A protein has these predicted regions:
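Short, flexible helix/strand-to-coil boundary loops that buttress conserved ligand/catalytic motifs
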Residues: 64-67, 73
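Arginine/glycine-rich "motif VI" loop of SF2 helicases in the C-terminal RecA-like domain
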Residues: 75-78
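Short S/T/G/P-rich N-terminal loop/turn motif that feeds into the first structured element of a domain
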Residues: 1-48, 58-65, 81-108
Length: 108
């Protein structure tokens, strides 16, 4: 499993951003291999993290080539003060079974 953390500081969102964001979210969720997404906001609201989970890197590559994603990436300065992407291989995930999370790969 692959996780892609999109860590960012938001600026102002406009109608163009909201439309692109909705299209990108819909495309990502429809990809073969999409597992889920997890989102976090810092206590002060200045930092956010959207973590997307996929079965394989092929899905990540497909998302990265999506035309609307490329438009958003080219115009990111309009909507973000800064960002960092962290792509990781999830080698394990565990819990007590009472908290559902996209990274639960050990489901037995």
């Amino acid at each position: 499993m692959i996780s892609c953390s999109f860590i960012f500081s938001p600026a102002e969102y406009d109608a163009e951003f909201l439309e692109l964001d909705a299209k990108i979210e819909s495309f990502a969720a429809a990809l073969v291999g999409f597992v889920g997404v997890d989102r976090w906001v810092s206590d002060d609201g200045k930092s956010r993290n959207s973590i997307y989970y996929f079965d394989a890197m092929d899905s990540v590559r497909e998302l990265s080539r999506y035309p609307e994603h490329l438009v958003a990436k080219a115009n990111y300065r309009k909507w973000y003060l800064g960002y960092q992407i962290v792509v990781s291989e999830v080698v394990g995930s565990y819990g007590d079974g009472f908290f559902q999370h996209p990274s639960q790969i050990n489901k037995d």
